[in-house]
Regions:
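Active-site-proximal alpha-helix that buttresses catalytic centers in soluble enzyme cores
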Residues: 2-130, 141-213
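Mobile, glycine-rich extracellular loop/lid and propeptide segments
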Residues: 133
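Short beta-strand segments
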Residues: 136-138
């Protein structure tokens, strides 16, 4: 048996999220991170990270029957730049930081064994988990197609499960009035834990002021 539900979120808000105004990122100690700030969440992002507990964990959540309390958590490696990572950017702390409050509430570890460009291998690991999985990643790689035109996490989930239908999965990450959205959950269902994906739901988190329905 493998993953029965795979839920994917974009990391929470980063510098530049306040309608273009520049604010430094803040680390988990509440210290403005200086030159390293671009790798961290801003204060609004930390608010969303905390609010994810109410989205996924009793007694407040799961908020809808489409969600489940995750038994396994995945985020891109926040520290190491992997040897075959060709990105000009170093690793980001944001996906990991997005799941820290939830991980603490659930007393579960966050699997960060895969670099941010190694999401195909991450999907393989996630699909092998027995139960509900939550993944936090950079938004450019979550939809069917990445910003460079390659297969994204959603396409990897379909391909690796032998799923032929597309289920109206967005080909690129959805945008709102303020740009690429932070308030969505991609939900892939596979109740048997084996074989193809049987359903897809695009959910609005509706956690913070300004989140869209």
């Amino acid at each position: 048996m493998g993953a029965t539900k795979i839920m994917v979120v974009r990391h929470a808000e980063k510098p530049g999220s306040y309608n273009g105004a520049q604010y430094a990122g803040v680390n988990n100690l509440g210290t403005v991170a200086g030159d390293d700030g671009a790798k961290h969440l801003v204060t609004l992002g930390w608010e969303r990270a905390g609010a994810l507990v109410t989205l996924f964990v009793a007694p407040w959540g799961p908020k809808t029957s489409s969600l489940a309390t995750p038994q396994f958590l995945f985020a891109s490696d926040p520290i190491a730049k992997h040897d075959d990572d060709t990105s000009d950017e170093g690793p980001s702390q944001r996906p990991y930081e997005t799941l820290t409050a939830l991980a603490a509430k659930l007393s579960r570890p966050i699997d960060t064994s895969h670099g941010k460009n190694h999401y195909a291998k991450m999907v393989t690991s996630a699909l092998a988990c027995d139960g509900a999985v939550l993944i936090a990643w950079q938004h450019e790689d979550i939809a069917l197609t990445t910003k460079t035109g390659g297969p994204g996490i959603s396409q990897e989930i379909l391909t690796q499960t032998g799923t032929t239908g597309k289920f109206n999965i967005p080909t690129s990450w959805p945008s709102g009035p303020a740009g690429a959205r932070y308030d969505l959950v991609f939900v892939f269902d596979r109740p048997s834990g084996d074989g193809p994906i049987t359903g897809f739901t695009l959910l609005a988190q509706q956690l913070l002021a300004g989140d869209l329905p």
